[in-house]
């Protein structure tokens, strides 16, 4: 029988999932996206060539791997076309191996207009969305007014539904946000131009994945964003609009949850966050917090968002937040990324508890953003190392203090570091346990 493996982020996103998915797909026949949209930014470096994917699963760069966009993904036709063209310009025949669920909600221009208008209206309380219409598209889905891929099979009915939903949103855009209305004819024309392509990619995802499972094929589920951005379990309201945790796999793809064999949690050797929201171990944001160790993490780690281009906020490893990720996702093993970024630091800190109001010590995080904001990190300090760990592919070849750091993280989290990444390239990795074996 094959193995069904989930790869997801355990922090606030940007953990290095794209590289790991690409690495593991040499043993996978299918790679499935199950949540999010083109707000994801998965960076892959293969033989020095960098590719950033936002919507299409990272497995597309492997020959013979079928890639699926599941019903839990909100799909921007415009973003999909751009990505297909970029891949085809590089000689990757993406259309031949890409499939989509007809249950995918569509992201259309009025979603992007709403996203921008709302962030502007929030002023300094802005959530820090990517501005790509993700939240408003999920909102329409839950309100049952969203248009989906399956609506494209009847363009006459689609046009009627589109007119209703555009009228609904234009009322808000014009009268509340005082911005320009979205033009119905332009949106309809845009959708008509891509409808045939989208329809040609449709498969029954639940049925095809179940058949693949019964044939003993390996299926990899590729998460986007990170656990602490989950709509239900993250630092609400500074979260994304989908379930980024392992529970989202079943609802976002139609794959039975009992068939998942292994959950690989991607975790950076330190912590980063893009945009607004609480961050207990934060050291550096380029504005108010300017700790030199945090600046080192951001500079050496090239911490700029793959989707937004924004500087990421940086901080120490937060084992308290990670404990929640372990609980939420039933993590089997970790992949530790960017260990090499810590090279050259004299000492490294690990947050092992939060001090809450009243001097109460906790080892699991609060539920609310307000609770996170009140948390004061309690640190354990370990020695750093001066030797290079960059590109090292054997655990024993790592600097001794780097080995000790990895082992200490395993002790604190209770989860083995099955994979360790020491550089951006596919080859700069040590796989101690392969989830597909």
UniProtKB/Swiss-Prot annotation:
Keywords: Cytoplasm, GTP-binding, Ligase, Magnesium, Metal-binding, Nucleotide-binding, Purine biosynthesis. GO terms for cellular component: cytoplasm. Signal peptide: none annotated. It is an enzyme of class 6 (ligase). Its cofactor is Mg(2+). Binds 1 Mg(2+) ion per subunit. Its EC number is 6.3.4.4. Pathway: Purine metabolism; AMP biosynthesis via de novo pathway; AMP from IMP: step 1/2. It is found in: Cytoplasm. The active site is at 14 (proton acceptor), 42 (proton donor). GTP binds at residues 13-19, 41-43, 312, 338-340, 421-423. Substrate binds at residues 306-312. IMP binds at residues 14-17, 39-42, 130, 144, 225, 240, 310. CDD domains: AdSS. It comes from the Bacteria. InterPro entries: Adenylosuccin_syn_GTP-bd, Adenylosuccin_syn_Lys_AS, Adenylosuccinate_synth_dom1, Adenylosuccinate_synth_dom2, Adenylosuccinate_synth_dom3, Adenylosuccinate_synthetase, P-loop_NTPase. One of its GO terms (molecular function) is adenylosuccinate synthase activity. Mg(2+) binds at residues 14, 41. PROSITE patterns: ADENYLOSUCCIN_SYN_1, ADENYLOSUCCIN_SYN_2. GO terms for biological process: 'de novo' AMP biosynthetic process; IMP metabolic process. Belongs to the adenylosuccinate synthetase family. Plays an important role in the de novo pathway of purine nucleotide biosynthesis. Catalyzes the first committed step in the biosynthesis of AMP from IMP. Homodimer. PANTHER family: ADENYLOSUCCINATE SYNTHETASE. This is Adenylosuccinate synthetase. It comes from Psychromonas ingrahamii (strain DSM 17664 / CCUG 51855 / 37).
